[in-house]
């Protein structure tokens, strides 16, 4: 099993945070993750994206065809929709426009539901990272807005998350 998820939007919208939240939840669930961060624009508001690959086996790269696109703006769909698989899922802005800085948390919640992961693991991760009720509410709103598509089962793999820098430093 392998899934590729693109998270795209304007610089400064919390794209990396979505990837961090979802990666933490997936690792807790026993899945291997690989995150590619694209930085074409360092100017706030320019287009940025991450591709998060998920697998039940070790992985060391991303794939070009996408199973899910999280679009934090319309430009993301214009640029990346051509790479979406025919049965792929798009998580857009519908119903989330009023969330402001919690848009990314809501979209992370929506993705966790699409993946078929238990809401409690999501809420525990949100509480661990943000410590506020608004973020919890946004995550729940996102989760409740979607239907399950992939039904990931909890695995017994014991995995930790490391950045490339951490891995190099540890040898």
What do the PLM-derived regions correspond to, one by one?
Residues 1-171:
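Active-site cofactor/cluster-binding pocket
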